[in-house]
């Protein structure tokens, strides 16, 4: 008998700012075992130019992957490896920091609403000192599934299975298997998604409200889900949500600012390497 995933806990996003004053809603899970392999979800949402125009000036990372997904907006990525990429409405970009990267994400847009997400994904110890990587995914490369009763699925990373159909997104190079899906639906539409039972899973609602089984999740809340082989969602009203699933990493997590390693000694080494200018040479 198929075991349905249910809500273990609902976590509200907390308002804060990052970069040069960009307004965000944040859910951090650095020390939550059922959050792994994910570390943090930031919802970037601002109606006023003043709340995003400063962007994210050059800053370092080591030991993580970042996946940025834009619902509405236009930003540019630059890094010390020479990569330049544009992130447009409906598109995504992924970066594996490995042993070190310095990058910026700055707005090209001069007006209009900003709405998107940045997800931090942990790198397993074996990858934390690997060369950095970068990929961008234009809106047309995001794989979509439209269904009149089940709404719209946009698969950004990994694979998802619905009614024996497997849909694979453009990002498949994460250090451990991970899936990120945007599900949008009108009131009354529902969907059942098969989920790998060994994956952790969580669902963030960014618009409207929906039910996981018989439990409701409202805008701005993350539902941490129990283990199971199937996830059933039903839209209470027009809604948008982000489903994150991934293989947990059973390793120590030590977080300091933009660095995530396995020990404090490794964090201290990252700080020394950055201060010595080594990141610029990677």
Curated annotation (Swiss-Prot):
It catalyses: quercetin + O2 = 2-(3,4-dihydroxybenzoyloxy)-4,6-dihydroxybenzoate + CO. InterPro entries: Pirin, Pirin_C_dom, Pirin_N_dom, RmlC-like_jellyroll, RmlC_Cupin_sf. Residues 1-21 are annotated as: Disordered. PANTHER family: PIRIN (PTHR13903:SF8), PIRIN-RELATED (PTHR13903). It comes from Vibrio cholerae serotype O1 (strain ATCC 39315 / El Tor Inaba N16961). Binds 1 divalent metal cation. Its cofactor is a divalent metal cation. It holds the Pfam family Pirin_C. Its EC number is 1.13.11.24. The keyword ATP-binding does not apply. SUPFAM superfamilies: RmlC-like cupins (SSF51182). This is Putative quercetin 2,3-dioxygenase VC_A0969. Keywords: Dioxygenase, Metal-binding, Oxidoreductase. It comes from the Bacteria. Pathway: Flavonoid metabolism; quercetin degradation. A divalent metal cation binds at residues 59, 61, 103, 105. GO terms for molecular function: metal ion binding; quercetin 2,3-dioxygenase activity.
């Amino acid at each position: 008998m198929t075991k349905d995933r249910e809500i273990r806990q609902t976590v509200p996003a907390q308002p804060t700012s990052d970069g040069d004053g960009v307004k965000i809603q944040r859910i951090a899970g650095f020390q939550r075992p059922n959050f792994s392999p994910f570390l943090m979800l930031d919802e970037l949402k601002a109606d006023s130019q003043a709340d995003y125009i400063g962007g994210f000036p050059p800053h370092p990372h080591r030991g993580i992957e970042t996946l940025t997904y834009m619902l509405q907006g236009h930003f540019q990525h630059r890094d010390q490896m020479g990569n330049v990429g544009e992130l447009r409405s409906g598109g995504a970009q992924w970066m594996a920091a490995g042993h070190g990267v310095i990058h910026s994400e700055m707005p090209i847009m001069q007006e209009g609403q900003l709405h998107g997400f940045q997800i931090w994904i942990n790198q397993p110890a074996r990858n934390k000192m690997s060369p950095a990587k970068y990929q961008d995914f234009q809106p047309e490369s995001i794989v979509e599934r439209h269904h009149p009763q089940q709404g719209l699925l946009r698969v950004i990373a990994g694979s998802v299975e619905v009614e024996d159909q497997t849909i694979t997104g453009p990002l498949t190079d994460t250090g451990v298997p991970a899936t990120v899906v945007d599900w949008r639906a009108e009131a009354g539409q529902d969907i059942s998604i098969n989920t790998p039972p060994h994956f952790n899973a969580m669902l963030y609602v960014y618009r409207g409200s929906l039910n996981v089984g018989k439990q409701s999740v409202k805008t701005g809340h993350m539902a941490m889900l129990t283990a199971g082989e199937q996830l059933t969602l039903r839209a209470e009203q027009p809604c948008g949500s982000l489903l994150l699933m991934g293989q947990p990493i059973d390793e120590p997590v030590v977080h300091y600012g933009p660095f995530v390693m396995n020990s404090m000694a490794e964090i201290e080494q990252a700080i020394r390497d950055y201060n010595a200018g080594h990141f610029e040479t990677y």
